[in-house]
Amino acid sequence: MSSFKPTINRRQSTKIYVGNVPIGGDAPIAVQSMTNTRTTDIEATVAQIKALERVGADIVRISVPTMDAAEAFKSIKQQVNIPLVADIHFDYRIALKVAEYGVDCLRINPGNIGREDRIRAVVDCAKDKNIPIRIGVNAGSLEKDLQEKYGEPTPEALLESALRHVEILDRLNFDQFKVSVKASDVFLAVESYRLLAKAIKQPLHLGITEAGGARAGAVKSAVGLGMLLAEGIGDTLRVSLAADPVEEIKVGFDILKSLRIRSHGINFIACPTCSRQEFDVIGTVNALEQRLEDIVTPMDVSIIGCVVNGPGEALISDLGVTGGNKKSGYYLDGKRQKERFDNEDLINQLEAKIRAKVAQQDPKNRII
């Protein structure tokens, strides 16, 4: 990888803990997702949480819309190790119930949680049990008076919603919280976060809400979150996709990886292919991405179909392949090796080399 990297001066925020995961301060930016199963389907929800954990999720959020779901949460919490956030809307009593069951964080929506006395009840409970809170402002559920005041969701409206609830928590002498101001429009979300970042010191949870399907949602999230992260704004993030939640974690880490903020797994450098390719680049990359999903150790692997750009990319990669006639050149740590790969068996050979280097470089295969 090129040594050129602009300096990102990260916004200084206070640090809180969601379970054992630090958020804010100098902590790594945490990547989280949310289950899309029925919470009352305990088996399916636990399975999905474990799938998210396998691809590197730091935190998982669960919707808890009813008291039945709260009872299910109790069982779910007992079966997983990853920190769980309970997503609470409308009924503050559900927050009090999951607090009894060991929830690691409570997400409340100012637009629908109700009067200040209800917020006070949640805060008193959170204080007593040392549970952090996320104030989750959303453009789609802004308080009625703010909608009337501003005419539509605006950055100023989202900021005002957030600050009025930050003020309540401050008044109650509660500082273990993070804040989000999400919108489905990139410009609205980005400007809202910029204003919020200047106004408070608490950690910020980033997200472009309801971003869309797997492709469009990933692009929209990369643009919006990328803008903020490059400015040093953000302490944890969730990519919202109408897709398998596992994809949210992958995209989240890809965004951080692209900005070289947090490394996770294989960074594939691959050409878009043309008639010069000497092997099936697209098929090779797709196969290796699937086979190597379990690898979380950071590594740059270049897969280039010909000798035009292949050698140059391989020089700045941990491992590299440059297409050749029947056999392709192999690079290790930027140096050309005598060994060459048979194009017909390139996928298997390259996978073996990558796994061998991971075992040598990082036996625990850990996330950075």
UniProtKB/Swiss-Prot annotation:
Its cofactor is [4Fe-4S] cluster. Coiled coil: none annotated. Binds 1 [4Fe-4S] cluster. Keywords: 4Fe-4S, Iron, Iron-sulfur, Isoprene biosynthesis, Metal-binding, Oxidoreductase. It holds the Pfam family GcpE. GO terms for molecular function: 4 iron, 4 sulfur cluster binding; 4-hydroxy-3-methylbut-2-en-1-yl diphosphate synthase activity (ferredoxin); 4-hydroxy-3-methylbut-2-enyl-diphosphate synthase activity (flavodoxin); iron ion binding. [4Fe-4S] cluster binds at residues 271, 274, 306, 313. It comes from the Bacteria. Gene3D superfamilies: Dihydropteroate synthase-like, Sulfite Reductase Hemoprotein, domain 1. The keyword Oxidoreductase applies. Its EC number is 1.17.7.3. It catalyses: (2E)-4-hydroxy-3-methylbut-2-enyl diphosphate + oxidized [flavodoxin] + H2O + 2 H(+) = 2-C-methyl-D-erythritol 2,4-cyclic diphosphate + reduced [flavodoxin]. Pathway: Isoprenoid biosynthesis; isopentenyl diphosphate biosynthesis via DXP pathway; isopentenyl diphosphate from 1-deoxy-D-xylulose 5-phosphate: step 5/6. GO terms for biological process: isopentenyl diphosphate biosynthetic process, methylerythritol 4-phosphate pathway; terpenoid biosynthetic process. Converts 2C-methyl-D-erythritol 2,4-cyclodiphosphate (ME-2,4cPP) into 1-hydroxy-2-methyl-2-(E)-butenyl 4-diphosphate. Belongs to the IspG family. NCBIfam families: ispG_gcpE (TIGR00612), PRK00366.1 (NF001540). This is 4-hydroxy-3-methylbut-2-en-1-yl diphosphate synthase (flavodoxin). The gene is ispG.
